[in-house]
Swiss-Prot record:
Record localization: Cytoplasm
Phosphoprotein recorded as keyword: no
Name the UniProt record assigns to this protein: Fructose-1,6-bisphosphatase class 1
Keyword Metal-binding annotated: yes
Name of the gene this protein is made from: fbp
Binding site for Mg(2+) 2: 103, 106, 268
Binding annotation for substrate: 106-109, 196, 262
Subunit composition and interactions: Homotetramer.
Cofactor remark from the record: Binds 2 magnesium ions per subunit.
Domain of life from the UniProt record: Bacteria
Cofactors: Mg(2+)
Catalytic activity: beta-D-fructose 1,6-bisphosphate + H2O = beta-D-fructose 6-phosphate + phosphate
UniProt-listed Enzyme Commission number(s): 3.1.3.11
């Protein structure tokens, strides 16, 4: 089996970009170690702090954020970073070539129940000149690399550099990421969907109707039965979609009119959309292709519908969108 370093060489990935990816991967190994120790290391539970989104930060949110910041500062290739846990962009190295956006611990509400969590990252080119928030406001099409690390029964890294999606598994003895799936591919059709049904009454009419038709199964207009899955961590739900197909959605809702969207564009939706498109799937807000969105702020939120291409098309048809044109 190829190691991650060997794979990056075989794909002729730019040397400095490969170095950055290896830094992210090495840091995820340390994060995996911290997650596994959990209560034994006293890292579970919440702090008394909130992040810029107004969410109470878990101890591991802060620990993993600091681990990634420290590693990226030492790497030398990074101009600046943006994190879910940082109010503002962070300047790293004046000579850096890349910008890194990340969610250090996606699904952190799962920590205290010992369920799935992960790290999501996106790499963008660093523009010339002074580093500001505007430096990061590039569409997802500009991403040079994206991926996530899933801390589950095995620690797994899903990665794209624009040459398909590869899956690596962390060997528990050698502590190396080894290539275990060279070509992740999302089947175009599916009978699985992932959504937080508790928000059903707050959705827009198109999503209400779409899900209602799925639940009708064989007796409904879709004429087949669907199963629902929900992990409550985007990284886990998207990993399932990449592994066996499906559709994942966190749609617009009016539960809190000031926050109609849940997921963040720069370090959740964009990297996941890049992975999904590279694996043959589609990713949309319901009205716009995610990777085509021009960001307006680093913590911008968007609706997300992604997964098996034909099922995403079916969902979009309820929104009056024909994505096959």
């Amino acid at each position: 089996m190829q190691t991650l370093a060997q794979h990056l060489t075989s794909k002729a990935v730019n040397e400095s970009l490969a170095q950055l990816i290896l830094t992210l991967a090495d840091t995820s190994k340390a994060i995996s170690h911290a997650v596994r120790h959990g209560a034994l290391a006293g890292v579970l539970g919440a702090t008394e702090q909130e992040n810029v989104q107004g969410e109470t930060q878990k101890k591991l949110d802060i620990i993993t954020n600091d681990m990634l910041k420290d590693a990226l500062k030492a790497d030398g290739t990074v101009r600046g970073l943006a994190s879910e846990e940082e109010d503002h962009v962070v300047e790293v190295s004046a000579n850096g070539q890349y910008l890194v956006c990340f969610d250090p611990l996606d699904g952190s509400s799962n920590i205290d129940i010992n369920s799935l969590v992960g790290t999501i990252f996106s790499v963008l080119p660093a523009p010339q000149g002074e580093l500001t928030e505007a430096s990061f406001l590039q569409s997802g099409r500009n991403q040079l690399a994206a991926g996530y690390v899933l801390y589950g029964p095995s620690t797994m890294l899903a990665l794209t550099t624009g040459q398909g999606v590869q899956l690596f598994t962390l060997h528990p003895e050698t502590n190396e990421f080894l290539l275990t799936n060279a070509t992740m591919s999302i089947s175009p059709d599916t009978s699985e969907f992932a959504i937080n049904m508790s928000n059903q009454r707050f959705w827009e009419a198109p999503m209400q109707t779409y899900i209602a038709d799925l639940l009708l199964g064989k007796i409904g207009p879709r004429e087949k039965s669907f199963n629902m899955r929900w992990i409550a961590a985007m990284v886990g739900d998207v990993h399932r979609v990449l592994s066996r197909g499906g559709i994942f959605t966190y749609p617009t809702d009016n539960k809190d009119p000031k926050k109609p969207y849940k997921l963040r564009l720069m370090y959740e939706a964009n990297p996941m959309a890049f992975l999904v498109e590279q694996a043959g799937g589609k990713a949309s807000t319901g009205y716009e292709t995610i990777l085509d969105i021009q960001p307006t702020q680093i913590h911008q939120r968007v609706a997300v519908i992604l997964g098996s291409a034909n099922e995403v098309d079916a969902c979009l048809s309820y929104h009056g969108i024909d994505s096959r044109k």
